């Protein structure tokens, strides 16, 4: 992987990630394909939304179908028929999500499979091996996602364990040609974030992710840690904000110098009838849309907006038709990609402030201070 920076506007950056499998323009939003599919989308439809990289989930794919079956097809790209880049997370966050069902030791995390109850040990080495088998273009280190809330002592202990696991991840990654990203932890404590980043830089990674945010903390805490941390990541390396978020969060992340984002929000919300539009959010199952023959968003160029009315989408939602979830997903993913394209163009033209002002004005929201 090569990372090139083309333009900056304030702290915001425009560039590209170059892989053997293609180029990803940054800032980039990466749709989440947990089980080797972005829910409801064919790879061709995903490509048409403007996505050029997606996520796979190490934890879930390791449990089902398992890497042996995936390797029989070649790798995850061949298995899911997506020949563009794939980033895989390490499984750390999913294990964190298991709560009391898991036990953390120096060696790794022991948990019971949510599928069959089998006892499984996931270590940094195992995570790297699984991600190598998946053929990931960007591999994430295995870390412990610090829970929120955590005392400074708890956050330090968690962060230090993650640093030791980062060393083991790097050693196991070895000669794998895929990019390897470190993950900055440290909870809501700026000093711990600094120690984490310094430790990761000493080990050396191809990119750096900001982890442990969007885990239930107040928005102002997320912004505070983002403000503190993003600038300190080496400028020549890509910066990835994990698991974030709403369209406004993407805009605020880009304003602070973030290059990459992922989140289940556009796809999950689509399946629940919550649709992102230029003016805000449309809840398509509301009765107000029953007779509305206008498109979902007249500024959107997606397949859904070009061909269907709000009334039809409301009807599909009321009938629980699968097509409704699919059309909603196409729209939400395209909306996110249009926001990212708008940000990239604005940075290139040195018009980011104008873009941001317009973005918030159309939603009737004030522009947050930087």
Curated annotation (Swiss-Prot):
GO BP term (any one): tRNA wobble guanine modification
GO cellular component labels: cytosol
Cofactor(s), names only, from the UniProt record: Zn(2+)
InterPro entries: ArchSynthase1/Queuine_TRR, TGT, TGT-like_sf, tRNA_ribo_trans-like
Keyword Zinc: yes
Annotated positions binding substrate: 89-93, 143, 185, 212
UniProt cross-references to Pfam families, sorted A to Z: TGT (PF01702)
Catalytic residue positions: 89, 262
Region of interest (RNA binding), residue spans: 243-249, 267-271
Keywords noted in UniProt: Glycosyltransferase, Metal-binding, Queuosine biosynthesis, Transferase, tRNA processing, Zinc
Cofactor note: Binds 1 zinc ion per subunit.
Positions bound to Zn(2+): 300, 302, 305, 331
Listed GO MF terms: metal ion binding; tRNA-guanosine(34) queuine transglycosylase activity
EC number: 2.4.2.29
Metabolic or biological pathway, per its Swiss-Prot or TrEMBL entry: tRNA modification; tRNA-queuosine biosynthesis
Catalytic activity: 7-aminomethyl-7-carbaguanine + guanosine(34) in tRNA = 7-aminomethyl-7-carbaguanosine(34) in tRNA + guanine
Family according to the record: Belongs to the queuine tRNA-ribosyltransferase family.
Protein known as: Queuine tRNA-ribosyltransferase
